[in-house]
Curated annotation (Swiss-Prot):
The gene is RBP-208. This is RNA-binding protein 208. One of its GO terms (molecular function) is mRNA binding. It holds the Pfam family RRM_1. Interacts with RBP-P. Residues 73-147, 158-236, 282-356 form the RRM domain.
Length: 447
């Protein structure tokens, strides 16, 4: 009995030790599983935090050099369809985060607005995901909002024109290219508001005149992106165009009212007796032409600039000069800036304003696209000399000119014609603001 009892007791002890070992193993496995889960959750959290930290939208508009959006939680919304309401705008932008405030400023053709988020990440996500989104068939523009004091006033600086910019060059790229000059204060690429594409030129501002002159000499012919750039002093018209673009892209809010000092300055400066200030002057004088340059060749060179509709081209081959008339003053001013110094047949041409303004009532009809310098092999049933793109462009220009002519005819007197010309050149505009309820600080919002 004693032997049997001892064996039974030993078996119980062994079973107890086995259960303890199993419990210890289960406990160790549970602890290991918990540690693994904690590690994985920590890694995921760290990865998520890193991803959110690295999330940064690409700048798509006129932000000031060195702008730091690290504390910004407000975005500007441009090119908003007139049918869009504030409630619809809030609904769209809440896809990126909780919206604190939304304000929509209505315009006849396209409105604009402002969206304030409770945190910066939501604002950054809105710029990344909503810029270019179509609402009511119209692509909106979304960018950071920032204090006006962050952009330096360059009205008294020295401005240079930079042409032949490739399509991928934006403000930040242009500024970085010229930032090697210590007095470089600003850089702007001019954009077409209808197409959203670069116009192929821009302006760079300098505090020091000597550095601006050095930049013109040293940077001309340098590669920026995929093209070699051309630099020159900005003419008065181009400087005003830059100021006008600043005014168009910016709304300065001061105690609930918009201020636009640059607009007033451009209206009051200068006399209309000078060609550069006379909206009726639309003709470009072209000098230093080789005697072999004829009307078609001159037309082709200015047509390739792509600055506007050409209505007349005249050449005095024996005297080495000619004239190119555009549909409006702004197009002619841009052509002077872009074509001056252009090498034609081995000679740099000289461009300036024609002496005589275009008489009121002059027929406004764009010339057909010029023939190419080579002649394609004739094919039956195919129009010769022009590409399909040329024909479409010509038809579009012709339609726009006819519409513009009808609008001008509806005006009364010369004042109406001048006003229509100014509007066609895009040199006048009115802008409104809205009161910033959260801060008395001036705010500036850029496209």
């Amino acid at each position: 009995m004693n032997g049997a009892g001892g064996n039974h007791q030993q078996q119980q002890q062994q079973q107890q030790r086995l259960r303890q070992q199993q419990q210890q193993q289960a406990l160790l496995m549970q602890q290991a599983l918990q540690q693994q889960q904690q590690y994985q959750s920590g890694v995921l959290a760290a990865a998520a935090a890193a991803a959110m930290t690295q999330m940064e939208p690409i700048s798509n508009g006129n932000l000031p050099p060195g702008f730091d959006p690290s504390t910004c939680r407000s975005v500007y919304v441009g090119n908003v369809h007139p049918n869009v309401t504030e409630s619809l705008l809030i609904e769209v932008f809440q896809s990126s985060g909780l919206v604190e405030r939304c304000k929509l400023i209505r315009k006849e053709k396209s409105s604009f607005g402002f969206v304030d988020y409770y945190d910066r990440r939501s604002a950054a996500l809105a710029i990344m995901t909503l810029h270019g989104r179509h609402i009511c068939g119209q692509a909106i523009k979304v960018n950071w909002a920032y204090a006006s004091t962050q952009r330096e006033d360059t009205s008294g600086h020295f401005h240079i024109f930079v042409g032949d910019l490739s399509s991928e060059v934006n403000d930040a790229t242009l500024y970085a290219c010229f930032s090697a000059y210590p007095s470089c204060s600003d850089a702007r690429v001019m954009w077409d508001n209808k197409t959203g594409r670069s116009r192929g030129y821009g302006f760079v501002s300098f505090r020091n005149q000597q550095e601006a002159e050095t930049a013109i000499t040293e940077m001309t012919g340098k590669w920026l992106g995929s093209r070699q750039i051309r630099c020159n002093w900005a003419t008065k018209n181009n400087a005003e165009e830059k100021q006008e673009t600043d005014n168009h892209n910016a709304v300065v809010l001061t105690n609930g009212s918009s201020s636009n000092p640059g607009m007033e300055a451009s209206q009051d400066t200068g006399s209309k007796e000078n060609p550069e200030n006379n909206p009726d002057c639309t003709t470009v004088y072209v000098g230093n032409l080789g005697h072999e340059v004829n009307r078609d060749e001159l037309h082709r060179h200015f047509y390739n600039l792509g600055v506007g509709a050409i209505e007349e081209v005249r050449v005095q081959q024996d005297k080495g000069f000619g004239f190119v008339r555009y549909s409006n003053h702004g197009e002619a001013a841009l052509a002077i800036q872009m074509a001056n110094g252009l090498v034609v047949r081995g000679k740099p041409i000289k461009c300036s304003w024609g002496n005589k303004p275009t008489p009121p009532g002059t027929s406004s009809k764009p010339l057909p696209p010029p023939l190419p310098s080579y002649q394609p092999v004739p094919m039956a049933g195919v129009p010769q000399g022009f590409s399909a793109a040329d024909i479409v462009a010509y038809q579009r220009q012709l339609t726009l000119s006819q519409v513009a002519a009808g609008q001008i005819a509806g005006q009364h007197g010369l004042a109406g014609q001048v006003s229509a010309g100014l509007l066609a050149a895009g040199s006048q505009a009115l802008y409104d603001g809205y009161p910033n309820q959260s801060s008395a600080q001036q705010l500036m919002y850029y496209n």
